[in-house]
Each structure stands twice: as structure tokens, then as C-alpha cells.
UniProtKB/Swiss-Prot annotation:
Functional note: NDH-1 shuttles electrons from NADH, via FMN and iron-sulfur (Fe-S) centers, to quinones in the respiratory chain. The immediate electron acceptor for the enzyme in this species is believed to be a menaquinone. Couples the redox reaction to proton translocation (for every two electrons transferred, four hydrogen ions are translocated across the cytoplasmic membrane), and thus conserves the redox energy in a proton gradient.
Disulfide bonds: none
UniProt protein name: NADH-quinone oxidoreductase subunit A
Gene this chain is encoded by: nuoA
HAMAP family in the cross-refs: NDH1_NuoA
Entry similarity comment: Belongs to the complex I subunit 3 family.
Source organism of this protein record: Bacteroides thetaiotaomicron (strain ATCC 29148 / DSM 2079 / JCM 5827 / CCUG 10774 / NCTC 10582 / VPI-5482 / E50)
Membrane topology type: Multi-pass membrane protein
Localisation: Cell inner membrane
Catalysed reaction equations from the record: a quinone + NADH + 5 H(+)(in) = a quinol + NAD(+) + 4 H(+)(out)
Gene Ontology molecular function, alphabetical: NADH dehydrogenase (ubiquinone) activity; NADH:ubiquinone reductase (non-electrogenic) activity; quinone binding
Length: 116
């Protein structure tokens, strides 16, 4: 196969992106002041340090939320096409659901759902 056309298109696209970025940096107005580098919080002036550590519990809840959010992202399309999939589709989604329930049981047993 001849990939010359593909290489030319990719190089042209990269060159275009590079020119646009360079042009925007060259002609964009700049204003350096202290307020530009402060964290913006709902229009209210910040109190204390802007960068602070969060407890690990927040990250654990976020990961659990993402896990079950992805579950619903898989369940909705499955529900739409479940009539066309037949028994094999039912078995596969049940297997997927059982794995997620086992993951939830494991997180519950380890105390991940309790705020400490």
C-alpha cells in the first residue's frame, strides 16, 4: 500500500496546528499580575492557601463512583438491544453485573463506603 497521501495529510495537519498555536501566542494580549495566578472560587476571594491536600477518602469515593458510572454506561445500551442479543447477551451482562456486585461487596467489606 502507498501511504504517501496519508503522510502528507498528517504532516499538513500538524503544520497547520503548529502555525495556529504559534500565531495565537504571537498576537494574543498578555497581562501579568498577581490576580491572574490566584485560584478563582465562585467570585469569592480565597482565604488561606489555594493548594491543599484532600483526604484519600475523596479519591476512593471518586473511583467507586466512576466504576458504577461506567456500569450504567454499559447497561443502558444493553437494555436497548437486549432483544436482539439473545441468551448469550443475557449471560454476558449477568456476568458483568455479578463482577460489579462482587466489587461492591468487597469495597463494603473493606470499609471503603464508610467515611472515617
Amino acid at each position: 500500500m502507498n501511504f504517501t497521501f496519508l503522510v502528507v495529510v498528517l504532516l499538513t495537519a500538524l503544520a497547520f496546528v503548529g502555525v495556529v498555536i504559534a500565531l495565537s501566542r504571537a498576537i494574543s494580549p498578555r497581562s501579568y499580575n498577581v490576580q491572574k495566578f490566584e485560584a478563582y472560587e465562585c467570585g469569592i476571594p480565597t482565604r488561606g492557601k489555594s493548594w491543599m491536600q484532600f483526604r484519600v477518602g475523596y479519591y476512593l469515593f471518586a473511583i467507586l463512583f466512576l466504576m458504577f458510572d461506567v456500569e450504567t454506561a454499559f447497561l443502558f445500551p444493553w437494555a436497548v438491544v437486549m432483544h436482539d442479543m439473545g441468551p448469550q447477551g443475557l449471560v454476558s451482562i449477568l456476568f458483568f453485573f455479578i463482577i460489579l456486585v462482587l466489587g461492591l461487596a468487597y469495597a463494603w467489606r473493606k470499609g471503603a463506603l464508610e467515611w472515617k
